[in-house]
Amino acid sequence: MTESLPDFEDLPLDRDAKILDHHPSGLVAIDKPVGVLTHPNRKDEKKARTLLRADYDFQEERYTWVDDAGGKRSLHLVHRLDSPTSGVLLATFSAELAVSLRKSFAARETHKTYYAIVREKGKARDGHWKDRLDEVREDGKLRVKAGRGHEALAKVTFERRRVGRLGLSLIRLEPITGRTHQLRVQASTRGFPIVGDRIYGDFALNRKIARASRVERLCLHATSIELDFKYQGNPIKFYAESPLPRIMGKLLS
């Protein structure tokens, strides 16, 4: 999409975030960097890096700021990514569109693709992962475990197996549901801990890889999102893609 809109020019993005694509409806796809919060935590320190350098309204799920001309601006989040996960994140200047797209996400009408680098300990097999996940609090921190809670569904494809000097594998994950920490837990419980996962991963492996390659990040990247919506009465198909980070590709060489 080549149209340039003034609304997109002065977004107070984090220094490493960038716009991947946008649409005249106000929809924008942002490449969220690793370690950056989608939005600030309610009790978070001011120093934490967030997607936008702006105030956040938790009730409305939007960032607000004043532009250079003195105008009040806002950007509504459509969905979220965990802080250690990088990749495609959708937001919009339209409150109405935000509500509509959030419903599309809840109704499983969007197609999302992630890539993860894992160590194979389980039996590698393409197919679908189906679980029930429980959210619990441990020492005041949110943790997710297999249990009897919300249904979690994802399609998995083993793209590259035991490659490079570290013998790691690249898997493509297509979540059908969007539960908290879903992909990280589903991979870990099946014997495929994601490299760099400090909660559900293989901590000894993480240390080994950090020493060998200096890669310490969670190797989970939201590669693409595809969705349909209507704009001015016309059906729109929107697709945004973020390439695999170079530092992750380095682990596969």
What residue ranges belong to the model's regions?
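RNA pseudouridine synthases
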Residues: 1-253
